């Protein structure tokens, strides 16, 4: 049943500043790797983009029914979804471009649709939330974006959280003044206060009766505030970013960045089996690893300022010169240790097997990024270099090898646009301007678009650039301190201060975040007792900081004695999709879709990225190869199950 709660008395007035007279058009050819030039053409004065009708929606659920509220700028309406047919009524309210806030609303609605209708034959398809279809409904999921085809209509449903990266209330508060300046009818002070209080009280929804008119009226009151806030922020984002906003933030960022670059990017690539095999194995993630674990009297923690944007600023224009079944050392690599070389003439990509006697190069194996004695895969030349050598003496090339040789035809093609964005962000940060966050989001979201859908002809996909950015990051951060305690993607925890010339507030320099005693019990799991600010991180567990501190101290004290303990940690898990639901429902029949579920997670220190042995500290060593790692992981998992977990309450008491 469709119910209209009320109509807005006054249509919200808004205006969008036109920051650019450029409209992108893409030339897409068949091919495997090429980033194609993006041509920009000015709009004629009498040309206008076709306006799109925009709406926003938000849901509330008790795990059985769904309250689905929608606002289109003039009217707020809602539907209560009790059976599959009601989903159609909800979709009828949506416009061709609609926004939701967070990774909750649409996935939960779709999963509940499957459960309500018992669409068992479609459940497998929607489990991964990538593709879902029934007779009259088709949904394709991308990251932060859904394409819905329903009843002859095409609806783009966009997760607005990606453009703000904080809670809805925080984002609305941050840009409250900006919304006023844009002419929006913003919430008054009393409404803001009530909205905040409502959000803090939202709990135990599974107890709510969606058949009670009074309950529905109360739900509608704050659901309406959510959807109006989402709607206003959706319209505001174009003006905030000052550039043409696309359906996702990474696409928005990379479209803008590429539009500022005059380059052909990568030239000379052709479809060839050996090339494809080499480049498919090239992409790896950041270095997230620990060489030592335990208690330390004094450590230094540093973060690289915007590490990936900085590495992106070093990307060159490349032209493939030759491929060969041989190995040739590049005597002038782009990076040696932490020193970049703007006079480098070539970039080599190798498909090789190498033997290393110390931890340098990382390879993907068994679903992890491992530094093993024998590494097989694809590598850049600079990954094999350090401050003094083009090929580290501890690295030997063994087995078959293949080399792709690229000529650098233009250096640092993204430098100007990256530095302009970064410097603008620094200036706004000094001014305490909330728009500072916008520039941070653009910088941090841009690099990943290069690596999307490797192996497909995506508009911005380029495996070489995506791989080079992360490889430069891994190589740089490890060479900051080859003997560091931990590497945390763009951070390093060391026993001694790093070189002073690497420290500063400029792009790519390292900022000292803390100094003091530390307990490190796993990757991203530590306490650092800096006199100015105690840092407590327990990656993978959403618990209060005070509880995390006690867990780390307890486990760390045992590790310091050479003993391993495990801890049972009660945690609340939000059931957002069918995959989670299926797993948890097997253990607990009371699990409800879209609701918090009380679960027990077990914390185990150490990890299987390295083989740890105890000698005052726990020291990590490399595995010989991926087979040895696979066998070790099986043995470790069997062993760790013999250690009975300790109840968290016994630690807290």
UniProtKB/Swiss-Prot annotation:
EC numbers: 2.7.7.7
This protein's UniProt keywords: DNA replication, DNA-binding, DNA-directed DNA polymerase, Nucleotidyltransferase, Transferase, Viral DNA replication
SUPFAM superfamilies from the UniProt entry: DNA/RNA polymerases, Ribonuclease H-like
InterPro entries: DNA-dir_DNA_pol_B, DNA-dir_DNA_pol_B_mt/vir, DNA/RNA_pol_sf, DNA_pol_palm_dom_sf, RNaseH-like_sf
Keyword DNA-binding listed: yes
Gene3D superfamilies, per database record: Palm domain of DNA polymerase
A Gene Ontology biological process term: viral DNA genome replication
One Pfam family in the UniProt entry: DNA_pol_B_2
Family per record: Belongs to the DNA polymerase type-B family.
Function: Replicates viral genomic DNA.
Protein name: DNA polymerase
Species of provenance: Acidianus bottle-shaped virus (isolate Italy/Pozzuoli) (ABV)
